[in-house]
Structure formats: structure tokens, C-alpha cells
């Protein structure tokens, strides 16, 4: 039996780092990439607070790559953005899992920094709707893999 999955992060140090992964999440890969870009480099507690604000529709996520026909959001100098609630909830679960993994290893949860977070496309769940005259319309659902690596910052 082979490896189930790998992480794209190299040089993982189990003494100082913890990681978590969410596989086959039924969220948009494009919005997941945008949220991950915002969270990369944040302290873990700040990232969880940020996601809570996104879920409460108080703070938008700027769209830098997938922003065609997106309206600007309120705020000084804020360009195209959205409130991806479903994506934020899914990524928050993975971040909490990474935090719990770090606590299990004995790392201080207040000193954890997100050094790697990535979203990758998962398999497509294919389906179809029957239509009139014997036809069918495809309904495909995208899935996404999220991986997170946190490191304890020593000051």
C-alpha cells in the first residue's frame, strides 16, 4: 500500500512545525487560492480572526487573479473582492486542525505562524440532470485540497 497523499511543502521539521490537510473539500478552487494568498505569512490566531470576519461579512477577501467583472468593495483603496463564506469555513477547519496538531506536539499555539498554505484542485464530481427529449445536462462539482504548515516562531 503506497502513500495516500503528499504535501507540496519541502524541508518539514517535525520538531518546530505542524501540518494539516483537508482533502476533497467541496469548495471553489479559485476562491480557495485567493483566501490562501491572504492568509500566507499570518500568525495563526490572526488568520482565524480574519476568517471569522469574512464569515460575518465584515471583511472582504481581495481578488487578485480571478477578478473578472467583480465589483469593488468598501474601504480605502480596496479593489475587487468577495466574501467567500463557504471557503472561509472550510479553511478555518483545516487551520484549527493544524493548531490542534501543534498543541499535541507541545508547540505554543500563540506563537504559530502560517509558513505554507496552498489550495490544489481535487477530482471533479461528475453528475447530470435529465432534460426533455432524452437529453442530459452535465452538473460537475469542483473539489479542492487544502494543505497548511505552521511553525512555532522563537523570539
UniProtKB/Swiss-Prot annotation:
Part of the 50S ribosomal subunit. This is Large ribosomal subunit protein uL22. Belongs to the universal ribosomal protein uL22 family. InterPro entries: Ribosomal_uL22 (IPR001063), Ribosomal_uL22_CS (IPR018260), Ribosomal_uL22_euk/arc (IPR005721), Ribosomal_uL22_sf (IPR036394). GO terms for molecular function: rRNA binding; structural constituent of ribosome. The keyword Metal-binding does not apply. It comes from Pyrococcus horikoshii (strain ATCC 700860 / DSM 12428 / JCM 9974 / NBRC 100139 / OT-3). It comes from the Archaea. Coiled coil: none annotated. PROSITE patterns: RIBOSOMAL_L22. Disulfide bonds: none annotated. NCBIfam families: PRK04223.1, uL22_arch_euk. This protein binds specifically to 23S rRNA. It makes multiple contacts with different domains of the 23S rRNA in the assembled 50S subunit and ribosome. One of its GO terms (cellular component) is cytosolic large ribosomal subunit. One of its GO terms (biological process) is cytoplasmic translation.
Amino acid at each position: 500500500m503506497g502513500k495516500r497523499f503528499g504535501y507540496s511543502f519541502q524541508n518539514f521539521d517535525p520538531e518546530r512545525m505542524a501540518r494539516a490537510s483537508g482533502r476533497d473539500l467541496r469548495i471553489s478552487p479559485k476562491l480557495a487560492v485567493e483566501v490562501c494568498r491572504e492568509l500566507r505569512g499570518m500568525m495563526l490566531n490572526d488568520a482565524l480572526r480574519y476568517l471569522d470576519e469574512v464569515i460575518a461579512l465584515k471583511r472582504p477577501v481581495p481578488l487578485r487573479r480571478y477578478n473578472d467583472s467583480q465589483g469593488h468593495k468598501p474601504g480605502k483603496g480596496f479593489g475587487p473582492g468577495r466574501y467567500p463564506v463557504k471557503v472561509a469555513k472550510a479553511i478555518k477547519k483545516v487551520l484549527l486542525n493544524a493548531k490542534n496538531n501543534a498543541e499535541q506536539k507541545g508547540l505554543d499555539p500563540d506563537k504559530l505562524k502560517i509558513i505554507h498554505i496552498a489550495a490544489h484542485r481535487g477530482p471533479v464530481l461528475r453528475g447530470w440532470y435529465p432534460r426533455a427529449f432524452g437529453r442530459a445536462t452535465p452538473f460537475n462539482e469542483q473539489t479542492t485540497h487544502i494543505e497548511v504548515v505552521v511553525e512555532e516562531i522563537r523570539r
